[in-house]
A protein has these predicted regions:
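Bilobed "Venus flytrap"/periplasmic-binding protein-like clamshell domains
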Residues: 22-54, 116-186
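Short helix-to-coil transition segments within interhelical loops
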Residues: 384-414, 441
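A ligand-binding cleft/hinge motif common to bilobed small-molecule-binding domains
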Residues: 81-100, 186-214
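Cytoplasmic-entry segments and transmembrane alpha-helices of multi-pass inner-membrane transporters
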Residues: 295-296, 301-303, 318-351, 368, ...
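C-terminal transmembrane helix and the adjacent membrane-cytosol boundary/short C-terminal tail
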Residues: 326, 381-385, 462-495
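Periplasmic-binding protein-like
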Residues: 105-110, 115-122, 201-245
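Loop-to-helix entry region at the N-terminal start of transmembrane alpha-helices
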Residues: 295-303, 349-375, 415, 459, ...
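Transmembrane alpha-helices
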Residues: 370, 403-436, 462, 466-467, ...
Length: 495
């Protein structure tokens, strides 16, 4: 029975790649406003062409989106020519879109023509700080190694990012730290850092009167916006993406970013765009908050339920083995403990390249299952080990088979500890599942990521409050289950 259940759960996960939601076209976006806006424009064009579209917002950086595209987890996402050359193809000499198209075809990927604007990297400072130090260009930073720099984590690791830039300009800055893109702007305005990396079409540059330092050595290449798509994407969908070609210049893109950040609504930016070009967008209407909450919550529940089912079915048997003395026990407890020490984002990144996983809900369920093992395994082992020798001797006198003793006597006696472990694991999983949105698995992490990107507390609470309520509901459910699953004589009574 147990083996059959495991097979069913694993089969559900494998089928899950095709059955989680089932949109005909899945779009991805990086974790910054402009990428969200561009994918929203593409989404509305695709819906106008008759496709059911899911936009997986803020999935991460270049490598995660590129892996997702290659593996078929998404059909398309917005990218930049400089990034394609430097980070994806690692062929900086590829000049034209035509050359890029030929090289990308080797990976089963196509590229649209340019959307019309260049969004290159830049370094920015507050006007007051730049004027105070007399800094106008990047080379001026060499005179001020004491300045505090806050860079996005992707920029710190890129081939066209901080390391090569530092060498090109001969900089020797003493304080360089990694920061989220949106939080970096807050740190800059609060005076916690002096310089940060930015995109030249960021609305926050004009909104906050920031100074863009001149790239006097011409380090940064052109970053012309395009869409990458899988070549097996339906022809009508590709044509819908291409309707965006040549329709966006720098000024229009900056304004779209500004609308999104001011209204906290990417659809509002898309509506303005379609009005400007004389098309009708937003074909399916704005999704209501109620509908979004239902969608996020249902996906979150699915992720938590599947991962917890796996953790229970596999964790309790492992806990039984771990309750016995010997090397196997130490190995099981050590490995489950080690998994718990791996940072959540690192575990997701490690799982993505594994065949049959990739980007999406399957990987999220596997990661959540691994994180959920330790409380269940350890509590099961502890509960069984704590059974007194007298009770064990009495069970032996009854001449029961080992399996019967385990199922009828030992596990019921250990049930309070086991259920406490399952309860702890469930609460942890509900919270950890919010990170699943970073790899396009959806759930209540979507509004949290979007809110962080927009610096909007209300949007963050749209995900945080339901997640907290879900955890409270789970706590209450387990309190009820305790009455049915724990033998009456073992239940704690108030004194």
């Amino acid at each position: 029975m147990k083996a059959r259940l495991i097979v069913v759960l694993i089969g559900t996960l494998l089928v899950g790649r095709a059955s989680f939601g089932g949109p005909s076209i899945v779009l991805g976006s990086k974790k910054f406003t402009e990428s969200f806006v561009l994918s929203e424009l593409a989404k509305q064009n695709l819906e106008g062409a008759g496709f059911d579209v899911e936009h997986r917002q803020g999935m991460g950086g270049t490598i995660i989106l590129w892996e997702a595209l290659q593996q078929g987890s998404i059909a398309a996402y917005p990218e930049y020519t400089g990034t394609i050359r430097e980070e994806i193809l690692k062929r900086p000499m590829a000049a034209s879109i035509g050359e890029l198209r030929k090289q990308l075809a080797e990976y089963g990927v196509g590229v649209t023509e340019e959307l019309g604007f260049n969004n290159t990297y830049a370094l920015v400072m507050t006007r007051a700080r730049a004027n105070q130090l007399g800094i106008q260009k990047i080379s001026d930073l060499a005179k001020h190694p004491e300045l505090r720099l806050g860079m996005t984590h992707e920029f710190l690791g890129r081939h066209d990012g901080w390391g090569p830039l530092e060498k090109r300009y001969g900089l020797h800055m003493s304080d360089v730290r990694g920061l989220d893109h949106t939080l970096g702007y807050l740190a800059l305005l609060n005076g916690e850092i002096d310089v940060k990396d930015a995109y030249t079409t960021d609305a926050k540059i004009g909104q906050n009167d920031l100074i863009v330092l001149a790239d006097d050595l011409k380090f940064f290449p052109q970053y012309r916006a395009v869409f990458l798509f899988r070549l097996d994407t339906p022809y009508r969908a590709i044509q819908a993406l291409r309707r965006l070609e040549g329709t966006l210049d720098e000024a229009r893109m900056v304004h779209l970013n500004e609308i999104a950040e001011r209204t906290k609504d990417y659809s509002a930016a898309a509506d303005w765009y379609f009005e400007q070009i004389g098309q009708v967008g937003n074909f399916n209407g704005h999704e209501s908050l109620q509908h979004r909450l239902i969608r996020w919550t249902v996906r979150h529940l699915i992720l938590v339920s599947l991962s917890m089912a796996l953790a229970i079915v596999i964790g309790i048997p492992l806990g039984i083995y771990a309750s016995k003395e010997g090397l196997a026990s130490e190995i099981i407890l050590t490995l489950t403990g080690l998994i718990q020490t791996v940072p959540s984002l690192a575990l997701l990144a490690l799982l993505v390249p594994i065949p049959f996983l990739g980007i999406g809900p399957v990987t999220a369920v596997v990661a959540l299952f691994l994180y959920g093992l330790l409380p269940i395994v350890r509590n099961t082992a502890t509960g069984l080990r704590d059974i007194s020798p007298q009770i064990r001797d009495a069970a032996s006198v009854l001449a029961l088979k080992p399996r019967t003793r385990l199922l009828k006597i030992f596990l019921p006696l250990a049930s309070p500890a086991i259920l406490a472990g399952i309860k702890t694991s469930t609460i942890i999983t509900i919270g950890s599942a919010t990170l699943a949105a970073l790899i396009g698995a959806g759930g209540l992490g979507e509004p949290i990521i979007s809110g962080l990107n927009l610096n909007d507390g209300t949007t963050i609470l749209e995900g945080a409050i339901p997640a907290a309520l879900m955890a409270i509901a789970a706590q209450g459910l387990f309190s009820i289950l305790d009455r049915f699953l724990i033998p009456r004589g073992l239940r704690l009574r108030p004194t």
